[in-house]
């Protein structure tokens, strides 16, 4: 969506224009400056202002001259015009020709003619022989690039008097960066707020240098929702990350470096060499052992729902593979499946994985991401803590094998109290939320405020809770060095990276 800012001469008494409207309206250059002033941006002399009443309106209304309806192709199908009147008040005009939408953000009486006229125009236009119908606009595809080029050419010819900017994603924009118009086009920061439907614009070339906060009647999120699937918003800085490249960036925010949640499949792809992954116990599913009663949704239905949503059978994936050529056994929990909660199936799969690693003398990695024990399975889920810990004891103490625990955000509850903290080496991701009880539970139980950041990985690291904080982009190399340090080497020495 393109945004235009005009220092328009609009008042409550009459609509006025910055230049003579008797000029040709073949382009947006109709809104221009023909005075020859050295500074067209701040030139507000009376000789350049013509009242609507000075224009012959026998054929067209005032609105015709303001928007150049005879050549409506000068507007693309989705434009927002940001306008300031000479009293200093600001408002926006939103025009969407394709969807027949015309809105003004302030219900001012002197704008009623404008809104009612254009609404009528959009609703009643027809392919008749009238001066309102623009055949070029409706009969052919007027491309974005052609629109940008024609606008810039028009602006250069008429030395347009625009206060700030045109902001677009056109590739052709850079081709004009050294031209005359570049002095009137500047980079602006438009901060969208999906909650309030408002945006803030800083006009760096404004005469008073002030900020204008303009609230529209429409919601920007609704207007741009067809583009939302292209972006992922950071939970920390709220910056946008292009979804197509986000996976290759290991779900790390490009703006602030925050580590967002990853699916278990993505983590396996990150850690395991291509073509070496061999999953275990994929057909193991829960059968609602205690027939948990729920008024909202039966436990079985909820399991089925998450299976369809994630493509997984349970909240953990286990299997064997190679990490830089080193054979390993690995289990990866997935928070997207019922919050990574540990039920009987999760406990059984991890226990079998540890036993397989014990029998095969393989190094073991478990990536934790869990809210704790699964309440829908009652004491059976709590029993998994002891069950996994028992298998881990045999693996570590009796067989003297090497177990690395990786704590990601969040790792809480029964997972923290059992195998999450039993690793020979415990690694945490940056800014990971690691705790036994959550902040809300502690505050409600003890009636005390939990200090901000006291359950973050960095705070726990300084208290000695685990061994290292390793970013995702370095994790595979760190693990490879740890395994080799403990006597686990690649099957093929050429696999070392």
Swiss-Prot record:
This is Acetyl-coenzyme A carboxylase carboxyl transferase subunit beta, chloroplastic. Pfam families: Carboxyl_trans. It is found in: Plastid, Chloroplast stroma. GO terms for biological process: fatty acid biosynthetic process; malonyl-CoA biosynthetic process. It is an enzyme of class 2 (transferase). Pathway: Lipid metabolism; malonyl-CoA biosynthesis; malonyl-CoA from acetyl-CoA: step 1/1. Keywords: ATP-binding, Chloroplast, Fatty acid biosynthesis, Fatty acid metabolism, Lipid biosynthesis, Lipid metabolism, Metal-binding, Nucleotide-binding, Plastid, Transferase, Zinc, Zinc-finger. Acetyl-CoA carboxylase is a heterohexamer composed of biotin carboxyl carrier protein, biotin carboxylase and 2 subunits each of ACCase subunit alpha and ACCase plastid-coded subunit beta (accD). Its main location: plastid. The lineage of its organism: Eukaryota, Viridiplantae, Streptophyta, Embryophyta, Tracheophyta. HAMAP family: AcetylCoA_CT_beta. A zinc finger (C4-type) spans 234-256. It catalyses: N(6)-carboxybiotinyl-L-lysyl-[protein] + acetyl-CoA = N(6)-biotinyl-L-lysyl-[protein] + malonyl-CoA. Its cofactor is Zn(2+).
